[in-house]
Amino acid sequence: MTEVSSLTGRLLVATPALADPNFDRAVVLLLDHDEEGSLGVVLNRPTPVDVGDILEGWADLAGEPGVVFQGGPVSLDSALGVAVIPGGGAVDGAPLGWRRVHGAIGLVDLEAPPELLASALGSLRIFAGYAGWGPGQLEDELVEGAWYVVESEPGDVSSPAPERLWREVLRRQRSELAMVATYPDDPSLN
């Protein structure tokens, strides 16, 4: 098997051609990617459920909108916390209960007391479920043209307007991808 170049910390942006309704115009932050598979969370699928309804202690730390996001179609009954540490979270200064994924972005131990992290977190999102791919599956989807792979920015995790994130991420690209942001929601109405 060939070695897999890690895409951990990067974004998968669904191409307009991706037909899976779970990922229509999705922006996925890859939390882990190696030869054993990939795991990520969809950053732009807010649910109507308030964070306080399922994780009361974390509600005050959740960014706006303060709702749970559907992280993907796998394990919808599990919760993941993704947070940004202001200043990039220096290696020796990473707070207890937070594990770096990429740069200032990391996973939060939701079993830890929220007050342990309250002063350290810049923004927090809670996700129900995740997106997962088996060995080689994501690579196959990339070859098929289902996803664009782009760099993430810490603000992507806590976008106050998640419904605009797909277009915003594409617009900031310095390539022909910026033009894809203008693609109509329903091309048949064009």
Task: Label each residue range with its predicted role.
Residues 1-190:
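A short aromatic-anchored loop/beta-hairpin motif
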